[in-house]
Every structure is written in C-alpha cells, then in structure tokens.
C-alpha cells in the first residue's frame, strides 16, 4: 500500500502512465471486491479455459484478458437481435467486466477516504464524513431561500457522447492505453449507441458495473459545475480583488478605488446585468436548484448560459424546457423527495392610538417542506404495497418468510421513511403511509395463514403495531417532558438528522 502514497499527493495522479500499470497488480482486484490482499478472490472466478491460477488475479491473467479484448476477431455483433448485441465467444463479457472492476478501483484511488485512512493507519472513518448528510442541505435552504426571489429547477441532461466522456477524463488521465481500454469498455455495453441515455443499453452498463458508471457520470457533472463556477466567479468585477497585483497592501486600496471608478463610469450598464451576489446553487444526482435575488432577465441569462454550455461544450442539444424559471412564493419544487416552497404568511395586529384603532399587516416568509401524497402513493404502488388508488394490498413475494421477518421488514421500511421525512412541516402524509404499510403487512400475514385480515388482527392484538411505532415519537416524547411545547406545536417543526447519507429507494422514485 505504500506505493499508493505518491499517487495520492496533490497532482500526483496526473502523472502519465500511472493507471495502466496498476491494472496488472493483483491487489487492485482484491480492493475492487473488498478482499484481503493475500486472500483468494471469490467474487469472480476464472473461466475453465484459463484456469490453473488458483482462482487468483495475477498480472499474467490480466494481460491475457486485455489481449483477448483487443483482438478484433473476437468482437462479433448481432445486427438483428438487440438482446444479443454483446460480445460473444470466449466469454469476453466476463473479461471486460473483470477489467472494468479493476479500472473502477484505480480511478477511485485519489478520491477514496477509505484508502486514505488506511494509509494513515487509522481504523476510524474521517470526521468530515459525518457532514455528508442529505438533510444538511435543508437548513441551508431554510436560511437562504426565504430572502430570494427567483428559482430555477434544472434537470441536468443525460445524453453525453462517449468521446466527450473520454475527453473529460483526459484532462487528468494522460495515459493513452487506459483511454483506449475505456473506449473498448464503452463499446461493449453500447454497441453503436454513442450516448449515455436512460435506456436499455445504459441500464445494462450501470447494472453490470455501477461503480464505473457512477464515476463517469460524476465526472461529467463535475465538468458542468466547474464551468458554471467559472462563470459565477467571472460574473462580478469584484473578483478582481484576488488578482496578483492587488495583493500588495500599499497599493491595494488605491487600485480598488480605481477599479470601482472605471466600472461605474465605463462598464456599469453591461456588468450590472451579470453581477449577482445572491446566487445559490444546490444539486443532488441529476437535479439542481439555482435561486437568486436578481431579476427575471438575469435568470434567463443564466438559462441561456446552461443551454449554450451543453450545446457547444458537450456537443448535444438540450431542450430549454429542462430549465424552469419561477418566482417565489408562487412556486413549489421537488427536491430530495420533498415538496418545498416559500409561502407568504399574513399576520394581523390591532393597534390603537388615542381614540383611533387600526390593523397592521405583517408579511413573513418561511421555508416549508412537505410530502406530496400522490407521488408517494405511486412509489408505494410501484413497490407493490398498494394499488394506484392507495388501497393496501398484500405482498405475495414475502409470504414465504416467517411472521417475525415479515413484520420486521414492513416496520423497518416505515421507520426509515418516517426518519427521512422527519423534516416535513406537515406530518399527515406520514400517517397515511403508516396506514398503507401496516394494512399491507396484515394482508400479507393473512394471505400466508389463509385467514381474513380482521380475524388475524384480533388474534395479534396491539403487539402487532409496536413495529410501526415511530422512533421520532419516542424522541419527541422526551423533548416534551423537558419543554413547554405542546405535541401539536412540536409536530409541525421540522427535524433534520445528520446521519442520513443516502436517499431511500422509495423516496428516490419521486425525483425521477
């Protein structure tokens, strides 16, 4: 592991020919499957025609696999049946999948906190990992969005030409053989489809090697955001403060004054269209939200920037309708499974001066997060917990499990959902979800025991509902014992947790 240290230094991973030699190291493939460096890798085994290496990953084996992939006479395509549109002969799909696993491990080396912690001989997870909670975004939105005017709902487009992806990686990977190998891996999964789109070919690519797919997609998104960040920093002349000549303290204020006079006299009319110190941007997966306190014209300018960026930098046309510009408080947007809005609340206060009395109107804005019941029911229906009308149904696939396992699965699903949606300002939808999952569990158990739901619930009694008791209710009961808040007041307050590192699968359907 010591030889990785040179690659983890700043700029060390940009050296030429560091990737391709690492593909021939046995421990790379052990790391790919979290195996010990001296333990046989059991996740994949070699085909019979190349056995005899004790099922270990060796440099000789990898060389033979890459050689077979490069041989053009092994590439046989089917032009009549798309389901057979893959490599055939000598198990080439296995070879390329194995190589792609090693490739994924190599490119993740500079970004792997697990590897960095192991190099430092520390077993604990770095502390900054605790700051990666999904819920940590919402306190930021609560603090910033109440003062903003416009919001843009942006869907980052998927179609990216394969060669563009290679060029993006080429900015920091200067290893030509590795880039050629990456092209071969692309063409195996796509076979003539030169774009990453949410279709069957991409589904096969992401399913067979999700680590490599996530890395490539994140590289593309980082490239988009880096250009956006450059435009954002260049949108205001105040960024000139960071230039080298202005670092001299003796001339700093004089030059700042000169810059201010020059911009006000000569360039003020043009720069005022781009300067926006109140621009805020958040993103999760392929959806991003950009909010501003500027004008509608400024938001349209940014929309034009994004469309031109995707068209001229990544060479594909994106519909302008993928960017929706709306104005608070008349707009609600979906983000991370929540329906968020900034409504205006009116409050009246009666004031009296001498013999005259009058009402004073006060306008306040508050960031609210709610659960939309219709998309949530659709997500539960897709998972076969209810129908599209929201009526609970049994889960036949779980009928063969034991009673305790069935109850535990349903209870765990609800506890995860209630934990994730603890930030909702209105908890009524959680009660509806609780009803659907609880009755679906009862129908599944009744189906297993060939009984009616009513008879089965009477036999179980109140113990059946203990698995669906909210963990948040236990926490809130402890808080109520020490505070003066009522249960009704506290139930409306959002609770954000800093231990949620991934979005729930049922919630994730809402953002698709």
Swiss-Prot record:
InterPro entries: Domain_X (IPR024937), Maturase_MatK (IPR002866), Maturase_MatK_N (IPR024942). One of its GO terms (cellular component) is chloroplast. Keywords: Chloroplast, mRNA processing, Plastid, RNA-binding, tRNA processing. Pfam families: Intron_maturas2 (PF01348), MatK_N (PF01824). GO terms for biological process: mRNA processing; RNA splicing; tRNA processing. The keyword Cytoplasm does not apply. GO terms for molecular function: RNA binding. Its main location: plastid. It is found in: Plastid, Chloroplast. HAMAP family: MatK. Usually encoded in the trnK tRNA gene intron. Probably assists in splicing its own and other chloroplast group II introns. Belongs to the intron maturase 2 family. MatK subfamily. This is Maturase K.
């Amino acid at each position: 592991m010591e030889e990785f240290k040179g690659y983890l230094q700043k700029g060390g991973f940009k050296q030429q020919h560091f990737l391709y030699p690492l593909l021939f190291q046995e421990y790379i493939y052990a790391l790919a499957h979290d195996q010990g460096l001296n333990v046989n890798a059991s996740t994949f085994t070699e085909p019979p025609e190349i056995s005899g290496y004790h099922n270990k990953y060796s440099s000789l084996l990898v060389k033979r696999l890459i050689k077979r992939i490069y041989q053009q006479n092994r590439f046989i395509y089917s032009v009549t049946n798309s389901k057979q549109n893959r490599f055939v002969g000598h198990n080439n799909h296995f070879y390329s999948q194995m190589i792609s696993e090693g490739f994924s491990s190599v490119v993740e080396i500079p970004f792997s906190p697990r590897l960095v912690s192991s190099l430092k001989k520390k077993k604990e997870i770095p502390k900054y990992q605790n700051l990666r909670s999904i819920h940590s975004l919402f306190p930021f939105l609560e603090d910033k969005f109440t003062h903003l005017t416009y919001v843009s709902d942006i869907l980052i487009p998927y179609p990216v030409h394969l060669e563009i992806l290679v060029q993006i990686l080429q900015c920091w990977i200067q290893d030509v053989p590795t880039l050629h190998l990456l092209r071969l891996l692309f063409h195996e999964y796509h076979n003539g489809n030169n774009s990453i789109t949410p279709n069957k070919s991409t589904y096969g690519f992401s399913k067979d090697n999700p680590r490599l797919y996530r890395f490539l997609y994140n590289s593309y998104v980082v490239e988009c955001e880096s250009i956006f960040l450059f435009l954002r920093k260049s949108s205001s002349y105040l960024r000139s403060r960071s230039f080298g000549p202005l670092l001299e303290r003796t001339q700093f204020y004089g030059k700042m004054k000169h810059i201010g006079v020059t911009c006000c006299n000569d360039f003020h009319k043009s720069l005022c269209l781009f300067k926006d110190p109140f621009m805020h941007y958040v993103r999760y997966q392929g959806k991003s939200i950009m909010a501003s306190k500027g004008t509608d014209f400024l938001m349209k300018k940014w929309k034009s920037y994004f469309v031109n960026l995707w068209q001229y930098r990544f060479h594909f046309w994106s519909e302008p309708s993928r960017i929706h510009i709306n104005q608070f408080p008349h707009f609600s947007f979906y983000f991370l499974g929540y329906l968020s809005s900034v409504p205006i609340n009116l409050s009246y206060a009666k004031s009296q001066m001498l013999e005259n009395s009058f009402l004073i109107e006060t306008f306040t804005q508050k960031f609210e997060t709610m659960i939309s019941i219709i998309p949530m029911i659709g997500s539960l229906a897709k998972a076969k917990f209810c129908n599209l009308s929201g009526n609970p149904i049994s889960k036949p696939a779980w009928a063969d499990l034991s009673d305790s396992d069935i109850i535990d699965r349903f209870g765990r699903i609800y506890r995860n959902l209630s934990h994730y949606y603890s930030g909702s300002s209105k908890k009524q939808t959680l009660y509806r979800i609780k009803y659907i999952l609880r009755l679906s569990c009862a129908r599944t158990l009744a189906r297993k025991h060939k009984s009616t739901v009513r008879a089965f619930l009477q036999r179980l009694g109140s113990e059946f509902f203990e698995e669906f008791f909210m963990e948040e209710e236990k926490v809130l009961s402890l808080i109520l014992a020490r505070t003066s808040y009522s249960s009704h007041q506290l139930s409306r307050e959002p609770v954000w947790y800093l231990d949620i590192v991934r979005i729930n699968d049922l919630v994730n359907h809402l953002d698709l």
